[in-house]
Amino acid sequence: MKLRNAIIIGVIYTPSICQAVVQYNYEYDKHYSNLVFINQDSSATVKPNETNHNQAEILIAPKNSKGISYNKYDRFHVTDAGIILNNKEVAAETIINEVVNGATSLLSGNIAVAGNAAHVVIANPNGIECHNCSFSNTLQETLTTGKPVINNNNDELIGYRLEGSISSLNETAFSGNPIDYIGKIVFSNENNRSSSHSFNKLNIISNNIKLENGFISSKKDIIIHSGKEEVIIKEGESILKQEYAMRSNIKRDNLPSQIILGDKNGDPKKQGLISSKNIIINASDTTIYNYGSLESSNRSKNAIQLNLNKTIFNNHGYILARGGYLDLKNGSFFHNMESGTIGMPYWLNTGKTNNIYSGIYIGLIPKDTISRMKNLTLNISEDSNLINDGIIMTERLHTRDKNMNNIQNNREDIKIYTKLRKIK
């Protein structure tokens, strides 16, 4: 590998100011030199993989007392050749990869951990684009546009801080992207329903999320957090907000707070989220559009959980599982549109582990037939509402005190439930 000195003009981001900084001594190789730049404050290094010189191999920073390797970058891209995070010597439990100065991270290949499996975090306030990206030898994966927060007292990762607004002075720090693209996570994947999942256990933490096409597929949970400036992952901890003297005196523009799942002109059966465990969406002050299919094959009563706070959810597609839990509070609104369907795939009631039972039929029943959910819980506050203009089918419907006042069914031909139960 050739080593050369490079002078890169970067931008340091704070909520109120930005300044230029000179960075020296990047390790250089013509195959990936424009893909991975290690920040000067990071002890990680990068080299070409011995068996594939087109592939970058990152020798990660030493771990702290809690097993966290914290790596900082000025640029972090992954081509279809993939990238390796070498964890053989460090044996970290969590590998944080934070882009502190740089453009949106473009992930088009596999991100593999060599050595001990670990939780891999990719954090970039400028956004992340996953185009058929995947992970291997990971315990779980976190894609976030927030800044990881480490507790200085005990070295633990306690959560992420996200920006809900941006000052006009600061917009140049985001590579000239329009404001509706800042802090955005975009997925664009193949229509792939195979048993080979791209993720093991996926966490998506961003206030601006879009699935353009295809599926986000995870072996375990898919957990989405949106709409908050602070996301706590360590119970009992808190993130202290940093105050900036100029902040209150500078006009700030609010960043979008939205989740768009699928192309509204696409086939809902060929895009969406697929999990063998749970799909959980935690959203506050967010507008959500589902044009795809949210599918869980877990047998839990809460296989798909929508925890909505001051949030609007417009379901144009499918929500399919044995059990669903909708928690609506503080003026939240769930609208199951005319094209929306909430139920259970017929194959899930056959005891089969997946829907690849036959090409077209399960016995004499078409494979894509939708039957009633086993359990659907609608925990709706007095100031929140659910309106159904599509199809909702469940055997047991659980509500507060068997109350249906906040549930409006506009489909007289659809009997939502067989049995009405009280939430225990």
Predicted regions and their residues:
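Intrinsically disordered, low-complexity Ser/Thr- and acidic-rich flexible linkers and loops
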Residues: 247, 347, 351, 357-365, ...
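Extracellular beta-rich repeat passengers
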Residues: 347, 396-398
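Solvent-exposed adhesion/ligand-recognition segments of exported proteins
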Residues: 20-277, 283-284
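Classical Sec-dependent N-terminal signal peptides that target proteins to the secretory pathway
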Residues: 1-22, 33
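Detector for repetitive beta-architecture
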Residues: 57, 75, 81-83, 104, ...
